[in-house]
Structures are given as C-alpha cells and as structure tokens.
Amino acid sequence: MEKEDNGSKQSSSASVVSSRRRRRVVEPVEATLQRWEEEGLARARRVQAKGSKKGCMRGKGGPENPVCRFRGVRQRVWGKWVAEIREPVSHRGANSSRSKRLWLGTFATAAEAALAYDRAASVMYGPYARLNFPEDLGGGRKKDEEAESSGGYWLETNKAGNGVIETEGGKDYVVYNEDAIELGHDKTQNPMTDNEIVNPAVKSEEGYSYDRFKLDNGLLYNEPQSSSYHQGGGFDSYFEYFRF
C-alpha cells in the first residue's frame, strides 16, 4: 500500500511540474504582433493609457533614465536600453483589469528602443496608439516606398543615445529634438573631424546646397555652398527633412 501511495504521489507531482512547464511557454514577439495585426482589428480596443510622467524610479536602472522621455523605454544598469509595451485589455477578456506586458527586446540606444515601441503600439492600438515619433514614423511603420523616397536624417539631442541608428530597411536615421537644436552661424573655419557625417550635396528649396553635417554636443552645424551666404551672416532655421 505504501509503495502504491508513493507511486501515485510521484506521478501527481510530475504532472504538476509538467503543467507548470507548459504554462511557462512564451509566445514570440513577432507572433504576438502578427496575431494582433490579423485578428485584433476586429476587436473593440480601449484608448492606450497615457502612462506615468515620472519615468523610472530614482536609483533604479541606468544613469540616463532620468533624462529619457521616451515612452516604454528604460535603461539597464549596464547601459543597454530595453523596450516593452502592454497589450490592450480587450485581448485578455472584458473582465481583466490589467493587460499583459510584452517584452520587445534590448537595444544599443534609447532611440532604437523607442522605434521598436512605436511599431508595436501601432500594430496593437491602431489609430489610438501613443507614439514617441507620431509624425516622423507615420503611425510607427514606414512603408517601403516611403522609405525609398525619403533620405531624411534625424538628430537626437538628449543624452540617451546621440548618433546614427539603423532601421530594418537598411536606412540610416539620426533622431532629432527640434526644441534642443541650434543652427551655427560662424562655423565655416572649423575643420572636419571624426564626428562628421559626409553626405551628397543636398538642394534645399531656398537654393542653398549643403554637403556636410557636423554633430558636436547635440548641435547641428551645416555649411552652405551658396555665394549669397557670407561669413557670420547665418541663415534661417530649417528643420524639415532633407531629401536626397
């Protein structure tokens, strides 16, 4: 009898362990987003929550968390950036008070993590999505034909991750913050350094031609080749995309 009892206990414990293991299976992020894109359109969705404005808790995460204002993005202690998003509540049922948190991955810069968040939010929430770059990304996902016809560069001026980032389409972008950008006036004497990005000449609507952009402490200096530009005179701010 004792042997039979021990055998039944072992079988029951094994079934419990196996059931726990089955519950731990996590659906890949790509599959989750594809499911929302295919099936979620017919579901009633709530407007995405605004979220907390306080950001990451003080003393938690990386040193640049206090200056990061991207939605769904935070920094690890070792410097990497992570992105995550909550699925709409309606996906788990009308009686659910909290939604499932979806891990989107680890990234080298805050801007890359913010782009990943925007793509996921656009798929899950559609027109109700709250995006980090609502105008620049066109709803979080750039169509192939738009990416081919656009060669714009964005400059991100916060401390989170200045520099060029790569998207899935192979296009390089530099994210910018319009409020923190200044255009230099008397920078024609500065030699080029390793920070500079050399691009083909860009023709603007005003007739100027720009072929060099210098990244220096979050400031964007460009040197026009027009004869009408005189040293120290400067030019008006121009924050639109440059089309190559």
From Swiss-Prot:
Gene Ontology annotations for the cellular component aspect, listed alphabetically: nucleus
Induction info: By abscisic acid (ABA) treatment. Induced by salt, heat and drought stresses.
Pfam families named among the record's database cross-references: AP2 (PF00847)
Any one Gene Ontology molecular-function term assigned to this protein's record: DNA-binding transcription factor activity
Tissue specificity comment: Expressed in xylem tissues, stigma, anthers and region where sepals and petals attach the peduncle.
Biological process, per Gene Ontology: abscisic acid-activated signaling pathway; cellular response to heat; positive regulation of DNA-templated transcription; response to salt stress; response to water deprivation
This protein's name: Dehydration-responsive element-binding protein 2E
The organism of origin for this protein: Arabidopsis thaliana
Gene field: DREB2E
